[in-house]
């Protein structure tokens, strides 16, 4: 009998964290790319039902605009990966995880981080899905 879920065969946790960050949400930027606060304007690879607001969770890539940060970064449209969310989600072992804030890391369209360090913890789901983010993270929860 085959294993359940696509993630089970790749060696990553096949958990799908709760999508708790809708379009329009403000996120704290947890790296040193120059942006401080971003606003979500779209979710990459989100296929929802009609007229439903797209939402994202830990490990998802979003399209966002920079609201606060260095003058050369402000008002730019960037891609980011969500590494923390306040809404709790359940892992397969029964543990429930939630963080103090909603945070993201600015990345290139290929998923390579634009900063060189990440402040604060990174969810394990995001670190396993985006290996380059996991390699520069100081704390993985």
From Swiss-Prot:
Instruction: Say which domain of life the source belongs to.
Output: Archaea
InterPro entries in alphabetical order: Ribosomal_uL14, Ribosomal_uL14_arc, Ribosomal_uL14_CS, Ribosomal_uL14_sf
The record's Gene Ontology cellular component field reads:
cytosolic large ribosomal subunit
Print the keywords alphabetically: Ribonucleoprotein, Ribosomal protein, RNA-binding, rRNA-binding
One GO BP: translation
Q: Which Pfam families is this protein grouped with?
A: Ribosomal_L14 (PF00238)
Any one Gene Ontology MF annotation carried by this entry is: structural constituent of ribosome
Q: Which family does it belong to?
A: Belongs to the universal ribosomal protein uL14 family.
Subunit comment for this entry? Answer: Part of the 50S ribosomal subunit. Forms a cluster with proteins L3 and L24e, part of which may contact the 16S rRNA in 2 intersubunit bridges.
Q: What does this protein do?
A: Binds to 23S rRNA. Forms part of two intersubunit bridges in the 70S ribosome.
Q: How is this protein named in the record?
A: Large ribosomal subunit protein uL14
Q: Which organism is it from?
A: Pyrococcus abyssi (strain GE5 / Orsay)
